[in-house]
Curated annotation (Swiss-Prot):
Gene from which this protein is expressed: gatD
Quaternary context: Heterodimer of GatD and GatE.
Family in the record: Belongs to the asparaginase 1 family. GatD subfamily.
GO biological process per UniProt: amino acid metabolic process; regulation of translational fidelity; translation
Record's protein name: Glutamyl-tRNA(Gln) amidotransferase subunit D
Catalytic machinery residues: T109, T187, D188, K266
Broadest EC class assigned to this enzyme: ligase
Region described as Disordered: spans on this chain: 78-97
GO terms assigned for molecular function: asparaginase activity; ATP binding; glutaminyl-tRNA synthase (glutamine-hydrolyzing) activity
InterPro entries named in the record: AsnA_fam, Asp/glu_Ase-like_sf, Asparaginase/glutaminase-like, Asparaginase/glutaminase_AS2, Asparaginase_C, GatD, GatD_N, GatD_N_sf
Originating species: Thermofilum pendens (strain DSM 2475 / Hrk 5)
Length: 451
């Protein structure tokens, strides 16, 4: 049982017969007494720290130096991790609400849970498991589900976007009564995938709703259940058929905000309300307790009868952030490696060092499409104000307007998957295909008054 722990910790735990997942009581030098499940130690960290799962769901680390005694309270009784449909309550008659929603699992915190009886981490994504974990879904929709991937979101590639778009198209064509598709996804690159579906799935009978979780389902502060409820409400009730993200709108469990995939960005590493609409407002707001949806706009792509999917993406596109002292060799590298498109995150209104302009000009001359977005995130590129911007335009750089850099990257990847014609590439990139570009910037689209 000592895997990951030091010999001193092993000696202490072995002396009382304690093993992983046994219930133990630990008395500390300051008189504090803690009870919980003895957990394996993470791969990284101090081997002299004992990890305990408290009854409130949180894990804590206890330094060996603070421990006075360990008492074994209850031995772990091993059992196999439940297979889909075997969990308690999974055979319950959930009733047959009229709407039907299809869940697609791709991995991430939202689509897995920890079984602390076995210690195993495994996907929960059958309809029965979703109902068991989130009973409120029973009154909202009939759930069908399928796991397409089980990967970390940072491992997503344009090839995965292609497979996901094809799967969503297949679901809408095959399941004529499905009101919407909910995609469970890791949060770190969720906005990339949501933007990709906005371009690839061009017509659909219902929305594609991306949902994730900042906190795992075994934590008391988990946002998973409420986010899934909100996403389901959107899939059932939204009048639009767009690719959107449904996540917490505040740190409280009161509101789910619905962001267009092409306008959303993860703006915090860990807050439950990490996602924000950039240069735009959320398209809708959900009250997850009432199961109601309130639209914030009258302009959207409505539900239709057809399913149109153009799923090809190019993997020869890069997103490059400019920084002071950046070497021209970086652009030369992409040219040598055969890249067909480059989105530069420039400073301010869309600038890079004048020392880079010749390299950029060479990229364009060799047939590489080069676009400019701003690393400011909010606001829009305007390369006609300063000489550097004007020189970049003369070199052939195409401004990305007020597109988020990540969206510009995804859009260019999708465009280069459709055509190699330079004029068509530029026409598509500068066109507003999925509400990713605004004609003008609105004053209240910047959250400067949040403090």
């Amino acid at each position: 049982m000592s895997q990951g722990y030091s010999e001193k910790v092993k000696e202490l735990l072995d002396s009382v017969g304690a093993a992983f997942f046994d219930r133990v009581k630990i008395k500390l030098a300051d008189g504090l007494v803690l009870e919980g499940l003895l957990m394996p130690r993470p791969a990284f960290g101090d081997p002299d720290v004992v990890v305990l799962k408290l009854d409130n769901g949180y894990n804590i680390g206890i330094s060996l130096q603070r421990i006075v005694s360990v008492e074994l309270l209850e031995k772990f009784s091993p059992r196999e991790a439940p297979t889909p449909g075997e969990e308690e309550g999974s055979q319950e008659d959930f009733g047959q609400p009229e709407p039907r929603v299809f869940f697609v699992g791709t991995g991430g915190t939202i689509a897995s849970r920890v079984d602390y009886v076995t210690g195993a981490v495994y996907p929960y994504f059958t309809a029965e498991e979703l109902y068991s974990m989130i009973p409120e879904l029973k009154r909202l929709a009939r759930i069908s589900s399928e796991t397409l991937f089980s990967i970390f979101s940072e491992d997503m590639t344009p090839s995965h976007w292609q497979q996901l778009a094809s799967k969503i198209g297949e679901i809408f064509r095959r399941e004529s009564d499905v009101k919407g598709v909910v995609v469970a996804h890791g949060t770190d690159t969720l906005h990339y995938s949501a933007a990709a579906m906005a371009f690839a799935v061009q017509e659909a009978p219902g929305p594609i709703v991306f949902v994730g979780a900042q906190r795992s389902s075994d934590r008391p502060s988990s946002d998973a259940a409420l986010n899934v409820i909100g996403a389901t409400v959107v899939a059932v009730h939204a009048p639009f058929a767009e690719s959107v993200i449904a996540m917490h709108g505040s740190v409280n469990d009161d509101t789910i905000l619905v962001h267009r995939g092409v306008r959303a960005r993860k703006m915090h590493t860990s807050r439950r309300d990490a996602f924000m609409s950039i240069n735009s407002k959320p398209i809708a707001e959900v009250d997850p307790l009432r199961g109601s949806l309130k639209l914030s706009t009258s302009t959207y792509k409505g539900r239709g009868d057809d399913v149109v999917v153009q799923a090809s993406f190019s993997d020869k596109v890069a997103l490059v952030k400019f920084y002071p002292g950046m070497s021209p060799d970086i652009f030369d590298f992409y040219l040598e490696k055969g890249f067909k498109g480059l989105v530069i995150e420039g400073t301010g209104l869309g600038h890079v060092s004048t020392a880079l302009i010749d390299s950029v000009r060479r990229l364009v001359r060799e047939g590489v499409f080069v676009a400019m977005a701003s690393q400011c995130i909010f606001g829009r590129v305007n390369m006609n104000v300063y000489r550097t911007g004007v020189e970049l335009i003369k070199a052939g750089v195409v401004p990305a307007g007020d597109m988020i850099p990540e969206t510009a990257y995804v859009k260019l990847s999708w465009i280069l998957g459709q055509t190699e014609d330079p004029e068509e590439i530029q026409r598509l990139f500068t066109a507003n295909l999925a509400f990713e570009i605004s004609e003008r910037s609105e004053f209240d689209h910047y959250p400067g008054a949040r403090w």
